[in-house]
Design a protein with these regions (language model features):
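N-terminal beta1-alpha1 cap of cysteine-dependent amidohydrolase-like domains
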Residues: 1-233
Length: 234
């Protein structure tokens, strides 16, 4: 996209000013699977790398997003035609949760090639805390239902930070948090009990303007009257 050109130029200048031994270009790219032919296609990545080179950037590492494992044949093809080492072709396949990604990247050797490229002394990584977090995330002891009251719930990323915070808090307490999104515009005295009677807690998300304000006030009233724990974010 034309919007990314200033950022790519900034990266090029950083590489030029700091030198290749003090910088590293990691190119995240998609390896699509074509159902019709039953194969993963590397051509889009080859074109992407070529376009980067035309802008003065050479990828040191390819991180290849795919929905399945990349064979050594595909990795060799990418290494040959994209002019990177075989070990620098890193697969990033779909995982159960985004928090699996650091472990997968370590298994693929991304940490080692990064340290090697930047000439940083290699030490044994300690990911015990991260693995413990993953274990608690995937093995909750019980579940709770939290209502998220907002006016932008149709946009999945509008309350991303709140949703991620609930994941972190739930994991720390070994609880799976089921989030029920409720549009504040559609809350009234007739349906509020039906929408919220199964909630263990309520979060009223921030929003600008008068639209949906009455619904938020009703949600707070419901929480106070029924002694449901609630948090209002302004």
């Amino acid at each position: 996209d034309i919007e990314s050109l200033p950022f790519l130029e900034a990266v090029r200048q950083v590489v030029y000013e700091e030198g290749p031994e003090n910088s590293m270009v990691i190119h995240l790219t998609l390896i699509p699977f074509l159902t019709a032919t039953g194969e993963l296609k590397t051509k889009p990545t080859q074109h992407s790398v070529k376009t980067l080179m035309e802008l003065g950037l050479k990828a040191d590492v390819l991180v290849c997003r795919a929905d399945r494992e990349l064979s050594d044949e595909i990795k060799n093809k990418l290494a040959l035609f994209c002019n990177v080492k075989f070990d620098c072709v890193i697969q990033s396949i779909d995982v159960e949760t985004i928090y699996d990604v650091p472990i997968k990247m370590m298994e693929e050797g991304l940490d080692k090639v990064t340290l090697e490229k930047l000439k940083i002394k290699e030490t044994e990584p300690n990911l015990d805390k991260w693995k413990n977090f993953l274990h608690k995330l995937k093995n909750p002891t019980h579940q709770i239902n939290i209502g998220l009251i907002g006016k932008y719930i149709e946009l999945s990323d509008s309350y991303k930070s709140i949703l991620e915070s609930l994941i972190h808090a739930g994991t720390e307490n070994e609880v799976k948090v089921n989030v029920k999104s409720i549009h504040s515009e559609y809350i009234d005295r007739e349906n509020i009990g039906k929408d919220m009677n199964d909630l263990d807690g309520i979060i009223v998300a921030p929003g600008f303007g008068q639209r949906g304000l009455d619904g938020k006030i009703l949600a707070v009233e419901y929480a106070r009257v029924n002694k449901v724990p609630f948090l209002v974010i302004c």
